[in-house]
Amino acid sequence: MPNRRDFLKTAAFATLGSGIAVSQVLAGECMPSAIHINKYGIGGKMKMTFFPYELKLRHVFTVATYSRTTTPDVQVEIEYEGVTGYGEASMPPYLGETVESVMNFLKKVNLEQFSDPFQLEDILSYVDSLSPKDTAAKAAVDIALHDLVGKLLGAPWYKIWGLNKEKTPSTTFTIGIDTPDVVRAKTKECAGLFNILKVKLGRDNDKEMIETIRSVTDLPIAVDANQGWKDRQYALDMIHWLKEKGIVMIEQPMPKEQLDDIAWVTQQSPLPVFADESLQRLGDVAALKGAFTGINIKLMKCTGMREAWKMVTLAHALGMRVMVGCMTETSCAISAASQFSPAVDFADLDGNLLISNDRFKGVEVVNGKITLNDLPGIGVMKI
């Protein structure tokens, strides 16, 4: 039987709200509930393959700092005892990774030194040690390993973490910065399919964007300013105006370098304020308490599911709210992030809906709500 005991010690499960101490989270002392492991032989080697894959966007995607029609991506597969786990690295421009850098990183990863994939903590600690950055590349390995381990366990990760799939949140659907006519068309297209929208702001036409959407729908809106507001009084005034327009939360209102100004805004804000660019990994979470109401966790920034789950647990232990977000991704990474979505307050997991060449079928959005399946691992099948 695979290394069940060691795996259960390191899967980092915690029952949210159970009084887990911050020190326990950081020390990795949170335990998963026991679960049956399918019978597979021991002694085989893990084999990893990877290849570039360009994601094609359905619409031109514009935020405060750039526009694009494609997103570079690298697909990863890890095979063990005839079972394959899938992962991916998505690389939007601001992340600072490229297909070349991801491929070069993955070439350095030697999984054959480990006897089986249930040494998840040791394997991913080794992967993390190979460079100080390359978070999307690390996430690709992490996701594929989690998918593989879940398949060997015969269970989806939401069950391994002890979560209730009926408690998944609605996901936002993102409307990028565009002309009023295009914004109206996009809003009409998605207004009947989603319960909450997300709008990218941070330019001179912010109010026009909101008014344009409000001419079509009164759905709740989450706003991502993408660090676009530089003056704290202006940011606070905008937030008060946005609250009057039915906005329910604000993401990264100001540049990450202006943490004191962000804290000033958050303390007076009538809406919850979430960190995005100010947050990357587990070590950043505690420092943001007080400056933000909550955090937005993205697998491509935090190295994957292992660290994301620790961040969820730590944020709750600190009394912070949690959002799970994404890049433009296939259903592989979206389904991976969805596994812990029952434990979060907000979800922005629409990245797979923004592309026209998804390689996978996985998590679905039904009546605007994230709907998990019971496929083992991260819950995906290749199309």
UniProtKB/Swiss-Prot annotation:
The lineage of its organism: Bacteria, Pseudomonadati, Bacteroidota, Bacteroidia, Bacteroidales. It is an enzyme of class 5 (isomerase). Keywords: Cell wall biogenesis/degradation, Isomerase, Magnesium, Metal-binding. Substrate binds at R68, Y94, K198, V199, K200, K298, C326, M327, T328, D348, L349, D350. One of its GO terms (molecular function) is L-Ala-D/L-Glu epimerase activity. It comes from the Bacteria. NCBIfam families: TAT_signal_seq. Part of a large, functionally divergent protein family. Protein modeling and substrate docking were used to predict the substrate specificity, prior to biochemical analysis. One of its GO terms (biological process) is cell wall organization. InterPro entries: DgoD-like, Dipeptide_epimerase, Enolase-like_C_sf, Enolase-like_N, Enolase_C-like, Mandelate_racemase_C, Mandelate_racemase_N_dom, TAT_signal. Catalyzes the epimerization of L-Ala-D-Glu to L-Ala-L-Glu and may play a role in the metabolism of the murein peptide, of which L-Ala-D-Glu is a component. Is also able to catalyze the epimerization of L-Ala-D-Asp, L-Ala-L-Glu, L-Ala-L-Ser, L-Ala-L-Pro, L-Ala-L-L-Val, L-Ala-L-Thr, L-Ala-L-Leu, L-Ala-L-Ile and L-Gly-L-Glu (in vitro). This is L-Ala-D/L-Glu epimerase. Its EC number is 5.1.1.20. It catalyses: L-alanyl-L-glutamate = L-alanyl-D-glutamate.
